[in-house]
Amino acid sequence: MSVKEQPHVPQPIVAIADVTFFKRSFGVCVIRAPHLKKNLYAQEVQTESVDAYKQGRINLEDRGYTIKAIVLAGRPGVRQLFGDVPIQMCHFHQKQIIARYPTNNPKLAASIELKKITDALCQTNERDFTDTINKWHQKRSSFLKERTTDPLTGKWFYTHKRLRSAYRSLKINLPYLFTYQK
């Protein structure tokens, strides 16, 4: 039994774009229109690059689609490519970024708190999330500034650099985390 393909109807869309890898150098760049319940673009890629997303956008626009907003994984170059439309950072990807820095099973109180704040990302709004993350930073500011000196070289480095990176990621991505609420 064959599946009847739905007719192609160019229209304004809210798109979700991401690259999924199945092997180290084999992935697929997909742009999906969730309200249509279909993938509008798919292309095999070896690496996740801005060009892969650019080709997808060109393909959709050439076929008559107008991207009204897009959900992205958060790669900065890709954001620039879609800078003319509202961009929503994927909450799953933001949580994965946070889990990657201080780990998914943190031991330090500051890391546990930041993970808890991030876990609530899908159940909050921009104002409350911003207030919470700012209060956390104010409380943990001196902890984040702690430095360790290497006894061999005499050079210093931030003791909690992975936690600092996690916080910085949230601050950089904050303008894109609640686009859907605007």
Where are these regions (language model features)?
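RNase H-like nuclease fold core
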Residues: 1-85, 162, 169, 173
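Short, Lys/Arg-enriched charge-dense amphipathic segments
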Residues: 4-5, 9, 32, 88-97, ...
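Alpha-helix capping at helix-to-loop junctions
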Residues: 36, 62, 87, 100-108, ...
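Intrinsic-disorder/low-complexity, polar/charged segments
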Residues: 49-53, 90, 122-129
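Acidic/histidine-rich catalytic cores and adjacent linkers
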Residues: 65, 72-76, 118-182
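Conserved beta-strand -> loop -> alpha-helix junction used to position metal-binding or nucleic-acid-contacting
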Residues: 70-115
